[in-house]
Amino acid sequence: MGNEVRVRYAPSPTGHLHIGNARTALFNYLFARSQGGKFIIRIEDTDKKRNIEGGEQSQLNYLKWLGMDWDESVDIGGEYGPYRQSERNDIYKKYYEELLEKGLAYKCFCTEEELEKEREEQIARGEMPRYSGKHRNLTQEEQERFLAEGRQPSIRFRVPEGKIIAFNDIVKGEISFESDGIGDFVIVKKDGTPTYNFAVAIDDYLMKMTHVLRGEDHISNTPKQIMIFQAFGWDVPVFGHMTLIVNESRKKLSKRDESIIQFIEQYDELGYLPEALFNFIGLLGWSPVGEEELFTREQFIEIFDVNRLSKSPALFDMHKLKWVNNQYVKALDLDQVVELTLPHLQKAGKVGTELSAEEQEWVRKLISLYHEQLSYGAEIVELTDLFFKDEIEYNQEAKAVLEEEQVPEVLSVFAAKLEELEEFTPELIKASIKAVQKETGHKGKKLFMPIRVAVTGQTHGPELPQAIELIGRETAVRRLKSI
């Protein structure tokens, strides 16, 4: 192996880009870029049953959307292609035939029923199920007899007996396995397709990977891949297994867990910003030196240290993601926030797709009211709901405010003031509130809170005069008089 760092993200095209896979890609990307190395994307599509049409392109599109680029892959080619495993079968054939020739692999004619029976018997005896090796030493005659019966063989790797397979994991430290607990494993299925562990080991060697960074659910695959490397006399790459991502109940993220949005495409659809997601995912199981939490892509590349990958599970905190995204939204100018949010108002049917100049101005003012507090684009629909309703509902907290004794006087005087205004502007609305204070003697919360609750249905919200302007004189007066 040369000195240049070469790492890969190797998705299966089985669906959309999951947050956990995005993190794996991101840490490999940051490691490569921070070391001046190469980041490669390889498509692992050997499991044909699970592949989804468009899955590959969707994954690549959303890696780009997040802000990653790569040096070699299916879309741009490279020196060590093809980068799609389904196009590499002739390459794998050469290597498994070499193992067969050297006696390091063998043909296994066991049927699924025989293997299942063996497995059940081992479990009944309290043993860890593994292949017994009963076809390890078949004679040529026995093999021919099985073939004559119409049996198709798989090919198994001959696991050396009594061996310790150890490696120093970047994240976990020293990890070791006993070969006797593994059993001879299949490297080529009966249909001639290489298995995951075999294809990955061959590809990682031929593509000159120096490091393999992936989720800890792959730890059990590592000794098998190491043994394949060793069987060919190849240098073994450095492994690092990242901890799981867990939800707020400290349970492993499951695709069935609906408390967390798990696919990058969904975040895009909800109006999260790619830069914010990049930032948030970059801190899922990795921590910088110091307290700062907001970093650009360039800053991440500059400070990324693979040795600071966390040994503890990474907590996916939805509140934290919203906070991070809000920081990025606040940094946008109003035109950008309108571009982010307007499609969501249109999709929800709140505003039309063709807006007059007057309507555009109203929508811009509305969106600007919520610019500072907006967590993500689609949230604008919920935040601004009160501006699109004829009638509003008052919750218990709001009702309690409206039951205070000064309320009828405050609201009736304020309604009269609004009706008298020649122009309905925030400045004149603010002056009207002050006039109510002067006329009634009520001030502070006793004055502002009933007005806010009566007109908006909420006990807190954006600047009150601006909100009342956008609600409109007629609606505001009607709501004030209905209490």
UniProtKB/Swiss-Prot annotation:
UniProt enzyme class: ligase
Catalytic activity: tRNA(Glu) + L-glutamate + ATP = L-glutamyl-tRNA(Glu) + AMP + diphosphate
Keywords of the record: Aminoacyl-tRNA synthetase, ATP-binding, Cytoplasm, Ligase, Nucleotide-binding, Protein biosynthesis
GO MF annotation list: ATP binding; glutamate-tRNA ligase activity; tRNA binding; zinc ion binding
GO cellular component, as recorded: cytosol
Motif ('KMSKS' region): 252-256
InterPro entries: aa-tRNA-synth_I_cd-bd (IPR045462), aa-tRNA-synth_I_codon-bd_sub2 (IPR020751), aa-tRNA-synth_I_CS (IPR001412), aa_tRNA-synth_I_cd-bd_sf (IPR008925), Glu-tRNA-ligase_bac/mito (IPR004527), Glu/Gln-tRNA-synth (IPR000924), Glu/Gln-tRNA-synth_Ib_cat-dom (IPR020058), GluQ/Sye (IPR049940)
Family in the record: Belongs to the class-I aminoacyl-tRNA synthetase family. Glutamate--tRNA ligase type 1 subfamily.
Subunit field text: Monomer.
Stated name of the protein: Glutamate--tRNA ligase
Lineage start: Bacteria, Bacillati, Bacillota, Bacilli, Bacillales
